[in-house]
Amino acid sequence: MLEFLNRFFGRESSSSKNVAKERLRLVLVHDRANVSPELLTSLKNDLIKVISNYMEIDDKALEVSLDGDDNQVALVANIPVKRLKRANSPVL
């Protein structure tokens, strides 16, 4: 029984440790890229405007983040698509 509790609580702290580690990594990526939260929000709004010309998207569920390591930073966007717009729709 004690072994079960140790494994159970050991996994919990390990999981919390990994979450904290990932959050710190994301903070460092944003810091190294010198990107403010305001710029990321502005970029997200611009992406919504452009992509909405071609697709109906769930803009409330859209996620934009920066990811990377010591050598490079990547922009990662998760954009839920509800449906594609017809090809003959006017594009501005």
Swiss-Prot record:
Ranges in coiled-coil conformation: none
GO biological process per UniProt: cell division; regulation of division septum assembly
SUPFAM superfamilies: Cell division protein MinE topological specificity domain (SSF55229)
Keyword Cell membrane: no
Family stated for the protein in its record: Belongs to the MinE family.
NCBIfam families per record: minE, PRK00296.1
Protein name: Cell division topological specificity factor
Native organism: Desulforamulus reducens (strain ATCC BAA-1160 / DSM 100696 / MI-1) (Desulfotomaculum reducens)
Organism lineage string: Bacteria, Bacillati, Bacillota, Clostridia, Eubacteriales
